[in-house]
Structure formats: C-alpha cells, structure tokens
Amino acid sequence: MLTTATVRGAGTDLYYERRGDGPPLLLVVGGGGDHGYYDGLAGDLADAFTVLTYDRRGNSSSVLHGRPAPLVMAEQSADALAVLDASGLESALVFGNSGGASIALDLAARHPGRVRAAVVHEPPVPAVLPDPGPYLAIYDEIDRLLATEGWAAAFTHFQAAVGGVPPEAIAVSLDPGPHLPPGPLRDLLVRVSRNWEYMTRYEIRSFIDYRPDLAAITANGTPVALARGAGTTDPALTQMSRVTAARLGAECVVFPGGHTAPLEIPGAFASVLRDLLDRLRPSGRG
C-alpha cells in the first residue's frame, strides 16, 4: 500500500511516500530528481522493505518557505531525518544515487545512529580524486555560463560535458511534454524539468564542492558500500566511487547499467541492491 504525506522541515515542507513492509529503507535522489525517479525501484523492493522516497527541498512538491539559497549538506541530512521522524523511524537503511549518494555519505558521517547501513551509488565527490582540477574545470565553465548566459545555457553544458547527452536530447529534457506520450514517465519528466533551474542555480556547485568526512564514517563504523555502474560512461564518476571505497575500506560493487540505472532498469538494479543490503544490514536490526 502506498501512502503519501508532507512533513515540515526547516524552511520547507517535504513531500514523501511510503510503501511496503519490512526493514525501513530511505531512497535519496540526486540533483533535479524527485520521488518518481525511484518509483520502479521502490515498487520492486516493497515486498522486502518499508521504502521511503521524498522530494528534496526546492524540488517538485517540496516547497520552500523564503528565498532559495545554495544547497547546504547538513540541511539535506536534516531533511532526510525529518522524513524518518515523520514515519516514526529511529533509523533506516539508506540508498543514494548521484547527489543523493553524497547525502547518504553525509548522513553516515553526521548521524551514524540513524543509518543502519548505506549504499552509495556514484557520488560526485571530486575532492577524493588525486587531481580534481580537470573535473572541476567543467563546473567552473558552468558557473561562467550561469553568470553570463543564464541557467539554461549552464544546464545544457552540464548535460553535455558531464552526461554526454546529445543536443536534441537536452532540448527534450528542457521541455519534454510535447515529445512524449501520456503516462507515468512523461509525468515524471515534466515534473523534473521544472526542477532544472533550481538545480543549476542552487545545487550543482554545492554538490561538487562537498567534501565527505570519510574519517568520521571510518571511526563510527557505519556499514557502507560504494556502487558503480557497469555502463557508466564518465570515468571520473567510476574513479570517485573506487577511491571513496578504498579510503573507507569498503566494497565497491558493480551494478548493472549506468549512472541513471535506478530509473532506467529498476528491476535489475533492485536485485543487486537487495542482496547488498541484506549483506550490509547489521544482524538483529530487522
């Protein structure tokens, strides 16, 4: 059974969904996404987990109170805890993809008592790289375009330079409605297209500048596994996952698909995630 609700956070109302039965599992989405990004994944996992998905502040149905401001990671973690609190949960398993993976790392570092285990899929954390300069140069150009040509030009460069997305597909992502037949995928893509400006102005740079406290995670002993996509085309993302895993002394598990596999192939992705969560989950914590 699917239930929906809203919880008040600090300066925001957070929309969230709950489905399934079993150990609680919080799915954290990355930049521009919303709860619908995980609909397929959550549905495939709901037979074994109580799955929570939500819209992060400023995205889709999670409205801000006051002026928008650059993303603050501690605030993102507090929002995730607000969803757990509203659901009556002391702790949960956590999965995050992309920017949501960075939030999962922050939760494990900052709030270890609330995280039973975390699976971290391709976090964009260039701070862990031995030479992050070439990767950061892409984001310096995004900043320049944002200041001189506007958010759409900056977003277009981001999609092309980081995701390798062709120009015609970027144009569709900015205005997907006329190009897609009615249905859940169209509804999702129309919703998230309205998040692109907020992501470009307030989230991208903050995610890239985030420095995960890997020493804190090592010290507190939260079970963490990194994940990378077998089909991921950006070698820097793969390297970030591998380096983060090595510094944590954690596994780096190969998942099917690429960076957006949780949306594109949820069934195959869920199968690997389910097995990994079962291995990571501390015994006796259900």
Regions found by a protein language model. Give the residues of each.
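Conserved hydrolase catalytic core segment
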Residues: E90-P130
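Alpha/beta-hydrolase
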Residues: P134, I138-E141, L145-V243, R247-E251
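Catalytic active-site module of serine/aspartate enzymes centered on a nucleophile-bearing elbow/loop
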Residues: A246-G286
